[in-house]
């Protein structure tokens, strides 16, 4: 009898243990969709699930800029969870990153929720999805590992959720004009620095992206879904994607999207939910949550639910239908489960074609060769390291035949020993091709985003794409250490990259006086260019530790310093010449809020705080006055619509400040405030193209879009003798995001301008 009782208890134990698991509704104390859930509550629920189930393990992978936790949840059968690392390594054998016989028994599905913070239904859906998987669909988990990132952008999401809770009506007001449907200047869509994390997968400029990319490349899933929201009037979108499709995408990747779509449609049709496919959302620009995984062999997709920051708990759309948060959660939850189901049912096809993707050695070019200063090469190498793209170095000076990026034609170009070489016969070779190719083939000129991103242009490097055999070496020559100052009167160093700018900023913050040369000179056996920096003993007599501090900063920034033995130049100006100008520590202000572009402001904010690491003042646009101007040397106007020149008193205050030496920097559309205004002499260039008034209606959208410049690389000619142009090469390649252009200044300095052929 005791044995029977013991057996009864053993059989009941899993039931009692499983019974401890609560649904999101039960755990949170409200029905999902009737409230928004803050990030710390989401974290707590996922911890509850992991503590209550042997089918889930959590993997914290970092923090946001504001200190919120980023974490993954691995969901599978108990047996798979126990050997999760074994499964990961076996899966990577499909790619060649790990040697050995591949594991083709498991499908790996990665679900990424809430990259845009105010597209907030998807994190709610993530909680419902993980609960459904482990309580209703254990059969799928027998051969599938599901990786769930419940919230990629918790800073933005909490910004939205907190704002909505503070501004909603009770009960909520579904009228679109209500305050709860109109966010403030810094919306919840973006992260702390107002960056769009869905456009940061490849560039990884933000800490959230950097941490996530490391985890993603440890798994390289078969399927990746990026959950989004769109306008309140749109039906649900799921793949297949629209054209253009990058030529590297395989037929199977598109075929599997069709399989998924048919399974999604089965559920949506049953519920009477509208959807659309093959429109609007293409697969081209490589920094999205669908394209980046696609170029790494996955079935990468975007799912788009109606909603975004306008929707709140409920909103009436233009058809008079109320769109509720409950509806939005249901749709994302359905496609999430349908995705896992389809992957589980087709795990063999996924594994077979995943292996084929990485085994395919066809490439447009065999290697990319790049050369430039150490300061320009270093940030590119950091990006390649993050994405685990292998690079080598040229072994000896070589004449290489291929496509020259600067000449924009096929020719033979000399590259010196140590030039950077990225071979494409590697596991990440297809991704390397996408990021480095000089021109991207387009199936359709109408695309969702920019069509130009080639990294050699972005990093300002001389480059060639070649099919020639390249002799390479694994290591580059080590850089020389900074010599002690000894009896020398200071150091000189180059200045031709943003890395050099960071070095200069660190020196200035450490109260080390620095000069730059306005003219070329020869001193201490070395030729110095315009813009080169000089750290001299005579400028730092009141700072006895300046030499030690300067060397420490140079070592930290991997910056070579060359000793200046005498102030007397062999050629050009001496160290005491007026041509060597002292660099003053500037007081900088950047305008924010109002009609300022939040995106452009965020770029500038991130630039100063996270890249340059130099202080600046954030000033509200409507609070700019003479008192503010008197305290600053530099005023930065991000893109936006400004009226500061409309009021005569404000215009005069600005002009007086500029006459006293104030420097004004205007970005993008901020230039419109000065166009046609005296005494600035700035004139906007009018577009000379005309639209045919008799054009058929169906062709009008395509014709109007052909006038737009949403992302193209242009060659600019730079005056390197001007202080602003010092350190640049004569040709500079820039990404233009609009068609706005201005006439050459007749009274002023044209430091850089687009050539006539641009």
Question: What residues fall within each predicted segment?
Answer:
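Short acidic, glycine-rich surface-loop motifs adjacent to enzyme active sites
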Residues: 190-197, 227, 637-640
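Proline-aspartate-enriched helix->loop->beta-strand connector
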Residues: 216-230
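Intrinsic-disorder/low-complexity accessory segments
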Residues: 20-120, 124-135, 139-145, 199, ...
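Carboxylate/His-rich catalytic cores and anion/metal-binding grooves
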Residues: 130, 143-167, 171-172
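Bacterial Sec-dependent N-terminal signal peptides
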Residues: 1-23
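Short, solvent-exposed turn/loop segments enriched in Gly/Ser/Thr/Pro and often Arg
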Residues: 149-153, 164, 227-234, 670-671
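Aromatic- and acidic-residue-enriched carbohydrate-binding clefts of CAZyme catalytic domains
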Residues: 175-195
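Active-site cavity-forming subdomains of large catalytic enzyme subunits
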Residues: 162-181, 202, 206-209, 218-221, ...
